[in-house]
């Protein structure tokens, strides 16, 4: 093999290390610099290069050269073992409060009460799909967790979903790995983004999704539960943890997401999913990540 070096920032170094390990290069060489986030810079011009980029990169050029020229050690040359598609099962017995405390301590929720994912509850959730429980829907970045149907169902139970919501969650997980989404960028950014899930087609009415007034407010069970389930999936399968992968400076009040349906029946436009070649009778999930907010006052 040939030496490779990743240039990273000190405040996201741990995230970079964990990401490299997840991609089977645990001994990747790193060089830390002080370059700040340039996501919102309008253009890469001479002033930016001279005033911001050069002062951060020039001091570490020698380290970069050394990392690229220094021969690999035997440890770095070794091929890492790739774990099989298995995950440890854990059984915990206790009161509802004890279960919630245990899950919170393990980092499996954000502290709000969950529905315990008992074997019976997960089996009931799996009745919402024809997929086998061990079917891998996707490998979710940043940590490339294998999102099996069973794992998705576990998080759906925890979030308070009904089995009829499971097809929406499976479709959303498939969408998460679309290159257009660039999930790593949104989940691991230093900026705060909010996941947005919009649903089209007959399934909106089948599951009772709110598509009208207060559709963003989370009063309605399907809207709130689906958004929370996807947030838990991002934590527990994607492996996105605060300060480890999610490096947002201030975060976002809607970080755990919003879910709503398009009000197709009262909209002056054709349903959004038809713009992508789908039929109006098809059900579809659209994913996006929002940073800015808009205020709508009066009227519809």
What is the predicted role of each segment?
Residues 3-8:
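Short hydrophobic alpha-helical runs that function as membrane-insertion/retention elements
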Residues 73-76, 84-86:
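N-terminal accessory regions of nucleic-acid-interacting proteins
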Residues 29-42:
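Long, charge-dense
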Residues 39-75:
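A charged, well-structured terminal subsegment
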Residues 11-26:
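Active-site-proximal loop->helix
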Residues 82-300:
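Non-transmembrane, aqueous-exposed alpha-helical and coiled segments at domain scale
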């Amino acid at each position: 093999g040939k030496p490779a070096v990743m240039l990273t920032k000190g405040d996201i170094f741990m995230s970079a290390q964990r990401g490299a390990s997840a991609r089977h290069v645990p001994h990747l060489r790193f060089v830390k610099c002080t370059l700040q986030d340039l996501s919102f810079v309008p253009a890469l011009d001479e002033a930016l290069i001279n005033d911001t980029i050069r002062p951060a990169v020039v001091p570490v050029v020698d380290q970069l050269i050394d990392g690229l020229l220094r021969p690999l050690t035997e440890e770095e040359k070794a091929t890492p073992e790739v774990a099989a598609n298995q995950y440890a099962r854990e059984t915990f017995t206790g009161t509802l409060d004890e279960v919630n405390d245990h899950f919170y301590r393990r980092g499996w929720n954000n502290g709000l009460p969950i529905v315990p994912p008992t074997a019976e509850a997960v089996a009931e959730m799996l009745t919402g799909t024809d997929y086998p429980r061990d079917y891998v829907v996707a490998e979710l970045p940043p940590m490339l967790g294998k999102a099996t149907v069973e794992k998705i169902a576990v998080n759906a139970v925890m979030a308070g979903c009904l089995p009829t919501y499971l097809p929406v969650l499976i479709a959303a997980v498939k969408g998460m790995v679309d290159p257009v989404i660039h999930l790593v960028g949104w989940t691991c950014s230093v900026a705060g983004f909010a996941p947005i899930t919009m649903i089209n087609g007959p399934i909106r009415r089948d599951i009772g999704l709110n598509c009208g007034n207060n559709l963003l407010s989370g009063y309605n069970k399907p809207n709130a539960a689906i958004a929370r389930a996807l947030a838990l999936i991002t934590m527990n399968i994607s492996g996105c943890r605060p300060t480890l992968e999610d490096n947002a400076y201030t975060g976002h009040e809607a970080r755990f997401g919003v879910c709503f349906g398009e009000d197709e029946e009262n909209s002056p436009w054709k349903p959004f999913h038809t713009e992508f070649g789908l039929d109006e009778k098809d059900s579809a999930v659209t994913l996006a990540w929002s940073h800015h907010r808009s205020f709508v006052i009066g009227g519809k």
